[in-house]
Amino acid sequence: MHKLTHRFGLTLFVLLSLYFVSRRFNVDNAEEISTKAFIKPFISYAPSFFTAPDNKLIACEISKSMSQLTLNLMCLLYNETQYLADNNSFSDTWATSNRSCTKEFNFLNPSEVLKIDKNTVRFAFVRDPFRRFVSLYLNKCVNKNECYDCGSDMRCVVEKIYNSFYDIQNSRNETLKIGHIEAHAAPVTWNCNFHQGIEKWELLAMGSDTEERVSSAARLADILRKQGVRGSLVEKIHKNILTAETAHSTHKSSNRYEAERQVREDPFVRGYLHKIYLFDYLVFPFDRRVLDTAYQKIDSKLFLEEVAK
C-alpha cells in the first residue's frame, strides 16, 4: 500500500490541469466535452526513487514503465561489485532476485546534497498510457487474477480503477492508502513528484516497439557517459536494455492481441481510459493518434497560454 499525498505544485503544468478541471472546452468537429469527470494530474503518492550518487543520477520508478529495468540498471550503477557478487541481471524481477541495493537507505532515498547539485541528472522511463494499461491488465488481471473481483473482465477493471482514482483525487484524507492495482495503474503525472517540475527530468519513451527502445537506449547511454560512467559499462547497459526480458514481460503474450483489440475497439473501455489518462497525453509528448478524434485535437499549449495570461 502506498501513502497518498495531495500536493499540487505551482508550475504552469499544474495551472493547466486546474484550468481543465474547472471548465468545459470545445473541440473542432466534436461535441462540447466536460472535463469534470477526468482524473486530475499531479497527485503525488509516495514516489519511488533510486540513486547512483557517484555518478550523480536519480531515477524514478514508474510501475509498468520498465520499472524492473530501472531498478536493475540503478542497482548496477550504485554498487557494481555487489551487483556482480549477487549474480544480478537485467532480467531479474522482485520474485526472482535478491537485490542487496534495495536494503540500502541511500539507494532508495536521494540525499539533499544530490537533489540540489546542479550536475545531478534525473531520468525516468515513460510509456504510452494505453499500452501501459494493457501491460497492467495482462500481468495483474489475466495472469495473476489480482484485479478486484473482475477476473479478466476489462470493462470491470477500467471502471473500478477509474472509480478508485476519482475517490482518491477528491479525498481530503492525507493518510488515505492507495492500493496495489492503483499504484500500478496511476497516471504518469502522479509519479516522480512531477508536480515539482517536469522540466527537471530526462524522459525516455520506452515500449515494446524496437525503434522506440533503440532511441531511448541511445539517449540513456549518452546520459551515462555524460555522468562519468565508464565506456565498457555503458556498452554493457546499452546491450542489456535492447535484449533483456523480465519474467513478467507481456509484450509477447498470446493474450496481448485480444487485449489491444478491445482497447482499440470497445467504446466502454476507451471512454474510461480517456477519462483516466487524458492528461498524460496533454502533458507528455505521447502520440495522440491512439485517442479518439475529438481528443486528438485538443491544443494543450493554447490552454496553457490562456491560463498564464
Cite the ranges covered by each PLM segment:
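Membrane-interface amphipathic segments in extracytoplasmic regions
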Residues: H2-K309
